[in-house]
A protein has these predicted regions:
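Catalytic or ion-translocation cores adjacent to nucleophile or general acid/base/metal-coordination motifs
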Residues: 22-196, 200
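Structured, charged N-terminal subsegments at the starts of enzyme catalytic cores
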Residues: 1-25, 39, 43
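Single conserved hydrophobic/aromatic residue that forms the stacking wall/gate
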Residues: 206-216
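Active-site phosphate/pyrophosphate-binding segments
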Residues: 198-208
Length: 216
C-alpha cells in the first residue's frame, strides 16, 4: 500500500485505521495482524528533508511498532524522483534524495529494522532515469543492504525488455551492480565527500538567495 505524498505520521497511521474498518487489519492477543505492506512515499524536497524525523516519530508509536513486529521488523520506503526534480530542480533533488537515503538507512539500523528503499524513477534523466546499474552503483553505502526495488516506466519497458537478449543483459547488469556494492568496503573518505557536496549546495543556495534579493 503506497502512500503518495506522505507528509505526516497520520498519513501512515490512517492506513491501519482504514484497514481495521474493512477487515484487512485485526488484533490477535494484543498484537496487530495484517497482510498490508505499508510504504510511505516521499516526493517533494520538503518531505525528503523531513522524512527521517517523521519515520523516527512513527517508530516510537506503539501501534506502528506492533505492525513492524507483524512484518518481522521490516519497512519499505519509497522515494519519488520525478516530483522531487519538478519541485527543486535536478541538482537539489538528487542532493536531497542522497541525504534522505543516508539518514533513513542510519535510522533503520539504529532501530534494528530491516528495510528496502523503493526508487520511483522515471524514464528521462530529469525524472531519475538512466542506466539502472549505474544508478545502483551511485547509491550511498549506508543503504546498500542487498534489498532494492525500482519502477520501470512504460516508455522504457520496450527498450529494456523488447528482446530476450537485451532483457537478459539488462538484468545481468543489475545483478552485477548489486554484487559489486555488497562487496565494496566502506571508505573512510565517504563522509568527507558528502560534507564537501553539502558545502557546495549551501554555497549555491546562498548565491541563489543573494540573486533573489538583487532582483527584488
Amino acid at each position: 500500500y503506497i502512500i503518495s505524498m506522505t507528509h505526516s505520521k497520520s498519513d501512515v497511521l490512517e492506513v491501519l485505521f482504514l484497514g481495521k474498518l474493512f477487515g484487512l487489519v485485526t488484533c490477535t492477543r494484543g498484537s496487530l495482524v495484517t497482510d498490508l505492506n505499508i510504504v510511505p512515499l516521499y516526493e517533494t524536497i520538503a518531505d525528503l528533508e523531513s522524512a527521517p524525523k517523521l519515520l523516527s516519530d512513527l517508530f516510537q508509536d506503539e501501534l506502528y511498532d506492533s505492525y513492524l513486529n507483524n512484518k518481522n521488523r521490516f519497512q519499505e520506503i519509497m522515494l519519488g524522483y520525478s516530483d522531487s526534480n519538478k519541485d527543486g530542480g535536478f541538482g537539489m533533488a538528487n542532493f536531497s534524495l542522497n541525504n534522505c537515503q543516508i539518514k533513513i538507512s542510519e535510522l533503520m539500523i539504529k532501530n534494528n529494522i530491516d528495510f528496502r528503499i523503493f526508487h520511483g524513477r522515471g524514464g528521462s534523466i530529469s525524472r531519475g532515469g538512466g542506466k539502472s546499474n549505474k544508478a545502483i552503483l551511485s547509491l550511498p553505502d549506508e543503504c546498500q543492504n542487498g534489498n532494492i526495488r525500482f519502477t520501470e516506466q512504460g516508455e522504457v519497458v520496450n527498450y529494456r525488455y523488447g528482446s530476450s537478449q537485451i532483457a537478459k543483459r539488462h538484468l545481468e547488469q543489475i545483478v552485477s551492480a548489486q554484487l559489486v556494492v555488497l562487496e565494496k568496503s566502506k571508505k573512510e573518505d565517504d563522509k568527507s565527500s558528502n560534507n564537501f557536496i553539502t558545502q557546495i549546495m549551501l554555497c549555491l543556495l546562498y548565491t541563489s538567495d543573494a540573486a533573489d534579493e538583487l532582483r527584488s
